[in-house]
Amino acid sequence: MRVIVDGDAAMYKNDICQLTLNYQIEMFVYLDYAHLLKDAPYPVIECEIGKDSVDMRILSDLKKGDLLITQDYGLAALALGKGAYVLHISGLKITSQNIDELLLRRYIGAHQRKS
């Protein structure tokens, strides 16, 4: 198992890093070139700047059994389909049992914001 961190979970990278070090688990952080970190104590996977470019790279590299940490429910749904485990940055475990409700809430929220 590896821990894959979507760059959007940026505020918790150091905490996640400490946990992965304690449990001797590999951790990779995916960021686009506009958000690169200098001297990070973990591997940073650099992605092109663009809509969903980081998400597409994560999906390309993600393996069954990996743990993805993200706040993107769309990415979470696709990761579940690849057999990965998914945690929201709030700590919520995202599963096949709750992803539909989370995606529906996202859709309704976006629709309300447009109104």
What are these regions (language model features)?
Residues 2-115:
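Nuclease catalytic cores that cleave nucleic-acid phosphodiester bonds
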